[in-house]
Amino acid sequence: MRFIILGVLFIAVASMILSNGVMAQSRDFSISEREIVASLAKQLLRVARMGYVPEGDLPRKRNAELINSLLGVPRVMSDAGRR
């Protein structure tokens, strides 16, 4: 799935660059095209680093895990209450 998304984004960027028939230089892009390329590059980098995760589907921590991580409670102590 990850490689399919990267492939689609790569093809989109390549087709945008090659749409004039030859490789365009950066001075040939309008401001809106530069913003589109920058946002696509940002998405590619995010997907390459952590895989495709739709916005809002990030893993959630339970309240106890969040409190323990904020307080710095050692894992041994937090596991003791579960036994």
UniProtKB/Swiss-Prot annotation:
Keywords: Amidation, Cleavage on pair of basic residues, Hormone, Neuropeptide, Neurotransmitter, Secreted, Signal. InterPro entries: Pigment_DH (IPR009396). GO terms for cellular component: extracellular space; synapse. The keyword Protein biosynthesis does not apply. The modification Alanine amide is found at A80. The keyword Transcription does not apply. Disulfide bonds: none annotated. Residues 1-24 form the signal peptide. Strongly expressed in eyestalk tissue and cerebral ganglia (at protein level). One of its GO terms (biological process) is neuropeptide signaling pathway. Its main location: secreted. GO terms for molecular function: hormone activity. It is found in: Secreted. It comes from the Eukaryota. The pigment-dispersing hormone causes the migration of the distal retinal pigment into the proximal end of the pigment chromatophore cells and thus decreases the amount of light entering the retinulas. May also function as a neurotransmitter and/or neuromodulator. Belongs to the arthropod PDH family. This is Pigment-dispersing hormone peptides.
